Amino acid sequence: MSENTFLVEIGTEELPPKALRSLAESFAANVTAELDNAGLAHGKVEWFAAPRRLALKVANLAAAQADREVEKRGPAIAQAFDAEGKPSKAAEGWARGCGITVDQAERLTTDKGEWLLYRAHVKGESTEALLPNMIASSLAKLPIPKLMRWGASDVHFVRPVHTVTLLLGDKVIPATILGIPSDRVIRGHRFMGEPEFTIDHADQYPQILLERGKVIADYEQRKAKIKADAEEAARKIGGQADLSESLLEEVTSLVEWPVVLTAKFEEKFLGVPSEALVYTMKGDQKYFPVYDNAGKLLPNFIFVANIESKDPQQIISGNEKVVRPRLADAEFFFNTDRKKRLEDNLPRLETVLFQQQLGTLRDKTDRIQALAGWIAGQIGADVNHATRAGLLSKCDLMTNMVFEFTDTQGVMGMHYARHDGEAEDVAVALNEQYQPRFAGDALPSNPVACAVAIADKMDTLAGIFGIGQHPKGDKDPFALRRAALGVLRIIVEKNLNLDLQTLTEEAVRLYGEKLTNANVVDDVIDFMLGRFRAWYQDEGYGVDTIQAVLARRPTRPADFDARMKAVSHFRTLEESSALAAANKRVSNILAKSDETLNDIVHASVLKEAAEIKLAGNLVVLRDKLQPYFAAGRYQDALIELAALREPVDEFFENVMVNAEDKDVRINRLTLLSKLRELFLQVADISLLQ
């Protein structure tokens, strides 16, 4: 066993399951940073996390910091002593800070002068002495939104702490962390194994905890076991488990000794829309639903117990009894809701505020209805179906099912609309109006759904910006960033012919006199263009490419995307760097000139062969490229413009732009402005690095 292995384990009460991984990873990152900053050499840093513990193991940790030579330069000699040769206050203060007197200081002489100098050999501190503060500091920096206090102490942490284990090899490092003295005591599983035992050496972790405490401390090992066992359990009943990553992570964080079991529920409940049943199983009970090979929900579920029972059937029966009333509630709500039409819920929307200054959900529904119809007309969707879907868009929020199972909003609207005999694209739109809900989520599948989804999001953006409540910092209570990116994704990926300018103006117009921000249209568009920046950065585009396109402020998202792809391709051309530099040069020349330019380049004033050649090329390209620009063929246009490299280079090599003759000078500046205008039809490539 190595004497250089370090172990820290913080034994707590049950930690928040959704935060367990981030707490453990942050703890590891913080400790690693502390070790690196202190200059302590170390090997691999492993983290462990279970419901009642956070732990780290560091391999090959140096016994002490390396010794180092310290040099601190003091005041110049001229400022260090007065006319009588007595030390100045500045010199005395510097010396005091170094722990010496002025006469003990050395002198440093260079060709620039002479200074006081403190030089010392500093012995590195022992690792044992440094670790307690490092651990305390690392714990204090954990991302804990809400701390709690326990007992009579003033100690705060995410949950009460019961044990602190600090071992360097086989030695306990004396310390008090979070109010608990360090020891070699570790607590095992609450109901299995040894409830408490001592660990002799850091290298024994986590195996000793597994063998004596019946706790799998390795998070990834625990997660892999749950996944494999659940897949096998589902296979045995002829199905496939819905092992969504988020739920798998949460369940992994809830158990120390996972035991996967299979249970069932009554088949009659399968008459309820599967989304409601799944919401209950996954959201409330943390169960894994099971589907057949055709994707149909089976009357079974898989759950994970935290104990290896002598009578597992008793645990299975208990879980079946727990879930049955929830499924019965869903069945009752579903049957009750269908006794009236979805549209009958419209009046009740008047009782729910969307936002105090912006009115009720009924008001929002009217706006969505009108805006969805307008959008449908722009993109060639069925206007009647879009307005109908807009009218019904929020009605399911008033149903019993959605009131009880909030995550079923939208999907229950779809089921109830189908029951009422609404058109299929209307029903689908009620569900897909919220898409995309998150990064990478599917987009609305039909034009009517696209119209309603865009209308809902644009109404929120226009309204909230219209009353001056735009996102600040990381606070975004109305999820405006997600809404903006959702609109952009739908328009770009569905290639819809929509302009943010007219779209925003229409959304704002529907609010009437309710909005107080006179700049709301520009604010919304600027915000959405900012979302474009984030989106394309995530897609791997360079910041300068994005800035080059943003400089033109294109408000048609599909057009913006075409420009981005064109500039990105342009950068791969051999001529791109030279033309970008030339555009930058042209931009600077034009910016420094305050002379009024001509409307056209006058051929009669052209004198040099290089300027005549460039002017001729521009005339040909201008006429050729206008149809390209009109059709959004920006990539083809930039490929053609790349041919200007040679005449542009010749122009700058052979032509004096700022000629003494005013007419010649203005004509040459006009020529350069026409050159720049051609490139600006696509983007400001002078911004390319």
UniProtKB/Swiss-Prot annotation:
Localization in the cell: Cytoplasm
GO cellular component term, pick one: cytosol
Pfam families hit by this protein: DALR_1, tRNA_synt_2f
Recorded catalytic activity of this chain's protein: tRNA(Gly) + glycine + ATP = glycyl-tRNA(Gly) + AMP + diphosphate
UniProt-recorded Gene Ontology molecular function terms: arginine-tRNA ligase activity; ATP binding; glycine-tRNA ligase activity
Enzyme Commission code: 6.1.1.14
Broadest EC class assigned to this enzyme: ligase
Record-level GO BP terms: arginyl-tRNA aminoacylation; glycyl-tRNA aminoacylation
Record keywords: Aminoacyl-tRNA synthetase, ATP-binding, Cytoplasm, Ligase, Nucleotide-binding, Protein biosynthesis
InterPro entries referenced in this protein's UniProt entry, alphabetically: DALR_anticod-bd, Gly-tRNA-synth_bsu, Gly-tRNA-synth_heterodimer
Entry-linked PANTHER family: GLYCINE--TRNA LIGASE, CHLOROPLASTIC_MITOCHONDRIAL 2, GLYCYL-TRNA SYNTHETASE
Family designation: Belongs to the class-II aminoacyl-tRNA synthetase family.
Oligomer and partners: Tetramer of two alpha and two beta subunits.
Record protein name field: Glycine--tRNA ligase beta subunit
Gene name as annotated: glyS
